[in-house]
Every structure is written in structure tokens, then in C-alpha cells.
UniProtKB/Swiss-Prot annotation:
Reaction(s) catalysed (UniProt annotation): 5-methyl-5,6,7,8-tetrahydromethanopterin + coenzyme M + 2 Na(+)(in) = 5,6,7,8-tetrahydromethanopterin + methyl-coenzyme M + 2 Na(+)(out)
Gene: mtrA
Record InterPro entries: MeTrfase_MtrA/MtxA, MtrA
UniProt key word Translocase: yes
Source lineage: Archaea, Methanobacteriati, Methanobacteriota, Stenosarchaea group, Methanomicrobia
Name of the protein described by the UniProt record: Tetrahydromethanopterin S-methyltransferase subunit A
Source organism of the structure: Methanospirillum hungatei JF-1 (strain ATCC 27890 / DSM 864 / NBRC 100397 / JF-1)
Length: 244
């Protein structure tokens, strides 16, 4: 029998639109934009099953609940894609490519910015689980069969303790309250993405200005200290010459 570990106390640590099953199961199921029978999916052997409608906060919640349970080694992505947000494609891109400057590399979603997960959190997710992509499938029979197939391949718990992440919902991105997120048109998605990029660029410029001001201040201070030391040395030399 595969070795198991205790998930974080009170797992799942982040609340959301999902059901839970056996926490020792190696499989988590994300139904993306579809509302399937998550209870039946958990009865088929999943540790946790539910939707994920946004490519930012939604993904953060999924990842937080996965890495806080070392027993989960597979994540099945299924159900329909969410128009504009593309949470399924974004999750796959994050697992494959990671995040650069807070943005999911390779994501085609509207606002693919991760604000609550550290580089260590993302690396842990990439190392802990294998993604199994059956996107657009809503067939409970096919999903249940995939759960059984992966359970038979259970490699045992990940070789590290549960990793706990705090998810703050007041950050940018679309909320998932009530499990309802309005799909975005391509035009609206593009506007949201550009607004987010501009916001981050402005923030980066502010940090650069502070850094440049600090460097300039340090140079001036160093110059003054150098002049003072030079005057002291010259004074000592003149005094010594007068004495001799």
C-alpha cells in the first residue's frame, strides 16, 4: 500500500465551490466551467472535486488545496473551458511554464496574474502533481474511469509535509463568489489584460524610481565622505611637513 501523510489541519484550507472525498486519495478533479456531480466524482475516488472559473484567484485556491495535501499526486482537468478566463488552459500553462513577474507564462486568459502564491508554492505544485488533461469532457463515466486508472498508479504521498498558503480575496482579478463568473468577450478580456499590465508596469516604475533615488543618494554621500577624508589627509600631511 502506498505511504500516506496527514494533510494540513482542517483541510481543505481554502473554501470554494467543491466537494471533498477521501483525503488519502491521490486524485483531485477540477471541472473548470462545468457544474458536474462533484459528490459522485468524490464517491468515485477523488480527494476533492469542483469548478475553477478564473485564471487568477480560482487557480490560487486550487493550488493551495493541492499543496496542503501531500497525498494528491494527480490533478484531472475536465469540463468546459471558461470563455475569456481560460482557467483550464491557464492551469496547464502554469504547471508547465511557471510564473514570470506574477504572470502565468503562456496563459491566454484575460488576467493571468498570480498574487497569493510564492515561487516555492508554484514549484511545489509543479513537482507534487501530474496534470491529466481531459478538458471538454463532462462524461462522469470517463472521469470516474480516469480516477480509478490514476489511483492504481498512486506513487504515495509527496516527500514533504503539507504546505500552507493564505489566499487573500481582496486582490485583483475576478471573484468567484457563489461559483458564478461572467464569461468575458475577447475584447473585454483584452482590455482587462492590458489594464492589469499597465498597473504592474506603473508599480515597477515606482520601485525603479525609489531604487534610483537611493543609488543617487548613496553616490552623493560617498562623494562627500571621500572629500572629507581627502581634506583630513591633506591637513595631516601639511601639519607633518610644518613640524619637520
Amino acid at each position: 500500500m502506498a505511504n500516506k501523510k496527514s494533510p494540513a489541519s482542517g483541510w481543505p484550507i481554502v473554501q470554494g465551490d467543491f466537494h471533498t472525498g477521501d483525503p488519502n486519495s491521490p486524485v483531485a478533479v477540477v471541472t473548470m466551467g462545468s457544474h458536474l456531480d462533484e459528490g459522485a466524482i468524490c464517491s468515485a475516488g477523488a480527494a476533492i472535486a469542483g469548478s475553477c472559473k478564473t485564471e487568477n484567484l480560482g487557480l490560487e485556491k486550487v493550488i493551495a488545496n493541492v499543496i496542503s495535501n501531500p497525498n494528491i499526486r494527480f490533478v484531472i482537468t475536465c469540463g468546459t473551458e471558461v470563455k475569456g478566463h481560460l482557467s483550464g488552459q491557464s492551469l496547464i500553462a502554469l504547471h508547465q511554464n511557471g510564473v514570470d513577474g506574477g504572470k502565468i507564462v503562456g496563459s491566454k486568459g484575460a488576467i493571468p496574474f498570480i498574487e497569493n502564491l510564492s515561487a516555492d508554492n508554484i514549484k511545489r505544485f509543479q513537482e507534487q502533481v501530474e496534470l491529466v488533461d481531459i478538458m471538454e469532457s463532462e462524461d462522469l463515466g470517463a472521469i470516474s474511469a480516469k480516477i480509478k486508472e490514476l489511483t492504481a498508479r498512486d506513487p504515495g504521498a509527496f516527500d514533504a509535509e503539507a504546505m500552507i498558503v493564505e489566499i487573500k480575496e481582496e486582490g485583483g482579478g475576478a471573484a468567484e463568489e457563489g461559483g458564478e463568473v461572467r464569461p468575458m468577450s475577447a475584447e473585454v478580456a483584452l482590455i482587462h489584460a492590458r489594464m492589469k499590465t499597465i498597473q504592474r508596469t506603473i508599480t515597477d516604475i515606482g520601485f525603479y524610481d525609489k531604487y534610483a533615488a537611493g543609488v543617487y543618494g548613496g553616490k552623493v554621500e560617498g562623494l562627500m565622505i571621500g572629500l572629507i577624508v581627502s581634506f583630513v589627509i591633506i591637513g595631516l600631511l601639511l601639519v607633518g611637513h610644518g613640524v619637520s
